[in-house]
Design a protein with these regions (language model features):
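Domain-edge interaction signal
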Residues: 11-228
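Extreme N-terminal basic, low-complexity initiation segments
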Residues: 2-7
Length: 228
């Protein structure tokens, strides 16, 4: 997946590796870690942001925007924004957890947005709308994350989801490498595919990200056990 001309990606030098060793990334492995409250709040705010700042924000468009946000941010920092795991489906990358929640939104998400029918040309589609009184909270995000979100909202403000296929279905991109003409249907799209093969110290960067994913998983497990 090509970059979208935002903040420069991190240089993977010694200081970056040290920073990554402290700031654990959400690096999806074979078993996704449970979503923390902070990450859940960030996800809800990201949905609010895209619903407020783009037109025709239905399910598929929202899924694509979240995918582009997560994979661009991972490409730059080694950490996703929402912590979602994406699968390769025919119509593009799908955050499966959100897909499963779509028909019955969790109480916290339902307090922020609703899904309403909207007539578009000759058919009816479901659109995400922000509920009255709900405001986007930028405090949940870093400046880098906000920059990516603003750039995506500006680029795809008036774009319908079918017109975004050229981006999410980019030849030899992350989705395409997994999808493989349907052979990889419903397979997980590794975040590592957002890092090009010729990236400086790619293997070292991904190794640190993987190690810190295990650390993050251990923290989440401890949090869950403490609340049990």
């Amino acid at each position: 997946m090509g970059g979208i001309g935002l903040l420069p990606a991190m240089a993977f030098d010694g200081s970056t590796m040290l920073a990554l060793s402290v700031y654990a990334p959400d690096f999806p492995g074979s078993k996704p870690t449970p979503m923390s409250k902070a990450t859940r709040n960030r996800l809800i705010n990201a949905i609010v942001f895209f619903a407020e700042n783009t037109d025709c924000c239905g399910k598929i468009k929202l899924f694509k925007l979240l995918y582009l946000l997560d994979f661009e941010h991972f490409k730059q920092t080694g950490k996703s924004v929402t912590g979602f795991e994406y699968q390769a489906w025919k119509f593009g990358p799908v955050p499966v957890d959100l897909m499963e929640e779509w028909e019955d939104l969790g109480p916290d998400l339902a307090r922020a947005v609703c899904i309403v029918p909207q007539r578009v040309l000759d058919f009816e589609r479901m659109q995400v709308e922000v509920l009255p009184g709900v405001e986007f909270d930028s405090d949940d995000f870093t400046e880098r994350q906000l920059s990516i979100m603003r750039a995506l909202a500006a680029r795809y403000k008036n774009t319908y989801s079918p017109q975004m296929i050229d981006v999410t279905h980019e030849q030899n991109g992350a989705w395409d490498k997994v999808w493989q003409d349907g052979r990889g249907s419903h397979e997980v799209i590794p975040y590592a595919l957002s890092i090009t093969d010729d990236a400086l110290d790619r293997e070292g960067f991904l190794k640190v990200a993987s190690q810190q994913a295990m650390y993050q998983s251990a923290l989440e497990a401890a949090r869950i056990n403490a609340g049990a």
